Design a protein with these regions (language model features):
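Conserved pre-motif I regulatory segment
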Residues: 47-51, 69-72, 76-117
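Conserved Walker A/P-loop ATP-binding site and its immediately adjacent core
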Residues: 126-159, 350-355
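Post-DEXD/H (motif II) to motif III coupling segment of the RecA-like Helicase ATP-binding lobe
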Residues: 226-227, 234-297, 470
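Conserved SF2 helicase motif VI
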Residues: 118, 260, 424-448, 466-467
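Conserved helicase ATPase core of P-loop NTP-dependent helicases/translocases
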Residues: 150, 184, 192-195, 346, ...
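Conserved helix-turn-beta segment of the N-terminal RecA-like "Helicase ATP-binding" lobe
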Residues: 147-191, 366
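Conserved interdomain hinge at the start of the Helicase C-terminal
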Residues: 309-350, 356-361
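PLD/PLD-like phosphodiesterase catalytic module centered on the HKD motif
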Residues: 485-583
């Protein structure tokens, strides 16, 4: 379960050095401190090491760093391997991996631990099945949500053939009982059917509390497996899952995730508990292999929020956005148009009330949308989720809250996503966009409608962050109705932006809008010829900067004959050409 070093053989300084390998700064503490908030109850450091029965114990993922430390100090290490690696089981993999999946699986099998980062739709579950069959040890698949248990069970039953050599359970009279343990067991979701061969469990169901002390404990069955696969392993920093992984003596521990980065900064804990990142699948390569064009449509709302005050919190801004009638009408119109064009839209909102309002507006427009929120009874919600595959040819719009459609939501025919409330974290965007990335017959293009509220600096900055993530995911960005124009509006990186930007300015036919935090004379000089050319053709040019320019920048503005305005309260950095091309 962990690496144990005898405490008696270590000096206090050596103990601190070794325990330091499993210790890192707590981002939450420093975040609160920088914002002058209370740090009560927030430790400065997060320590995953322990003192157990005369040993210093550190997570298995620290092995490489420990060996490096020992080499630097001239110490020779001797290992006693007490991990679980017996009870070999006859298993065969019944499927066939795609070439890119085979490469990923072979890379993982080189190591006894580690994380595979693969985007949604790559086939992490199938690769997990291949790892289980290849290793042939009792396996435990740990998932964060019960919805994933069903997915894993169906895939494992489909792809793995397991030879069951267990003695049959007999009745008190010696007859073979009709109730035999399952081949593939389930722990969680209201069931406790343990197989001992291959089991799937939610991590919440693997731990409990000591009846006498109240201390958290792990169920004994965790110690019976030679292989552990932690699906959506970015949850490994959760206290319950951390406890489970630190108590499991399995020889092999693998983590699978589309987003191994954590928004709270606890990413280091993942590599300590599951091992380092061993294989990463590039989302751009996945898009090429799938042959599915990825497009993002920025929808500039142009709204103003009279009640907005500088310094308002994100939740306060979100309240104003969700209540804005014109913005909601824009979202509803886009969803209806997508559905009428034969697409399958999914509208996601952070707020339950907002989702309900969009649902109502869609119904008022004569559509029959599907609503999924946490308010719906669990039984009814399950029935709705099970019925969704039947609506493929009806093109009904699904309206849901982000929190409800977390890991485990799988509807491969979805091809259009409308992000009704702003997000910025890379992992959230990747997860939401991943709803569209599953392969499906006839799927050739997926689209994301991104609603951009430039009037609020915080939301403008969030949009800039989203653009970077879209670029990493292989998306093209365009606003024009004609999809054939998408190629001309591809996301550009910093290595060749200037030539393309100048070309877009020269080819402008209506107007150019530029907003920047400051004006640089060097940058203005590089854009001087193209801006002057557009202005002489009668193209409207509006430039807004957030700080007064220096004299050299003022001179370039004067030479071009272009006016600018200063808005100190804004920090927007964007260029919009002809209300279509976005920088």
């Amino acid at each position: 379960d962990m690496l144990y070093i005898p405490e008696k053989s270590l000096s206090p300084a050596a103990q601190m050095e070794i325990r330091g390998l499993a210790t890192f700064a707590n981002p939450e503490f420093y975040r609160a401190q920088s914002m002058h908030k209370s740090v009560f109850g927030k430790p400065r450091l997060i320590d995953l090491s322990e003192l157990k029965d005369g040993y210093v114990a550190i997570p298995r993922g620290c092995k490489t760093q420990l060996e490096q430390l020992l080499r630097e100090t001239g110490v020779t290490a001797h290992y006693s391997d007490e991990r679980k690696s017996d009870n070999q089981i006859m298993m065969t993999f019944k499927g066939a991996l795609r070439p890119e999946q085979q490469i990923a699986a072979d890379q993982m099998l080189i190591y006894e631990d580690g994380i595979m980062s693969a985007p949604t739709g790559f086939g992490k579950t199938v690769i997990g099945a291949y790892l289980i069959a290849s290793i042939g040890l009792p396996a435990l698949v740990i998932v964060p949500k019960t919805a994933l248990i069903t997915q894993w069970k169906s895939q494992l039953e489909r792809f793995i053939d397991i030879t069951d050599n267990r003695e049959p359970v007999r009745t008190p009279k010696g007859r073979i009982s009709k109730r035999q343990p399952p081949i593939i067991g389930q722990i969680g979701g209201g069931k406790n059917a343990v197989s001992g061969l291959v089991d799937i469990a939610s991590f919440q169901s693997l731990s409990g509390k000591d009846g006498q002390t109240g201390e958290p404990i792990v169920k004994d069955l965790v110690r019976n497996y030679g292989l552990i696969i932690c699906d959506e392993c970015h949850h490994a920093a959760a206290p319950q899952l951390e406890l489970v992984l630190k108590s499991a003596p399995a020889k092999y521990v693998y983590g699978l995730s589309a987003t191994p980065e954590r928004s709270d900064g606890l990413t280091k804990a993942l590599s300590m508990l599951c091992g380092p990142l061993r294989y990463v699948i590039d989302p751009k390569k996945q898009a090429i292999q799938q042959g599915i064009q990825r497009i993002v449509r920025p929808r500039f709302t142009g709204i103003r929020l009279p009640a907005y005050e500088p310094g308002a919190s994100f939740n306060q801004i979100l309240d104003l956005l969700c209540a804005h009638a014109a913005r909601n009408e824009l979202i509803v119109s886009d969803a209806l148009e997508a559905a009428s064009n034969g697409r399958h839209p999914l509208v996601l909102s952070k707020r339950k009330k907002h989702a309900e309002e969009l649902f109502r507006l869609l119904k008022d427009r004569g559509h029959e949308p599907i609503l999924l929120t946490g308010e719906i009874d669990a039984k009814e919600r399950k029935a709705i989720l099970n019925s969704l595959p039947c609506f493929e040819h009806e093109h009904r719009i699904i309206v849901a809250t982000e929190s409800l459609l977390g890991e485990g939501f799988d509807l491969s025919y979805l091809d259009t996503l409308l992000i009704a409330t702003p997000i910025s974290w890379d992992g959230s965007i990747t997860q939401q966009a991943g709803r569209l990335h599953r392969s499906h017959e006839g799927k050739r293009r997926v689209e994301i409608f991104d609603y951009v509220d430039l009037s609020i600096p915080m939301l403008a900055r969030m949009y800039q962050k989203r653009l970077k993530t879209y670029a990493k995911l292989g998306y093209e960005v365009y606003v024009a109705k004609d999809a054939s124009q998408a190629e001309a509006n591809i996301l550009i990186d910093s290595s060749h932006f200037l030539e393309t930007l100048n070309k877009d300015i020269v080819n402008a036919t209506k107007n150019i809008f530029i907003a920047a935090p400051y004006a640089s004379s060097a940058c203005l000089t590089k854009l001087k010829d193209s801006l002057t050319s557009s202005m002489t053709r009668g193209i409207g040019i509006e430039i807004i900067i957030a700080s007064n320019p220096r004299d050299d920048a003022k001179a370039v503005f004067a030479e071009m004959g272009i006016d600018y305005s200063v808005k100190i309260e804004g920090r927007l950095c964007a260029t919009v050409i002809d209300e279509e091309t976005v920088w």
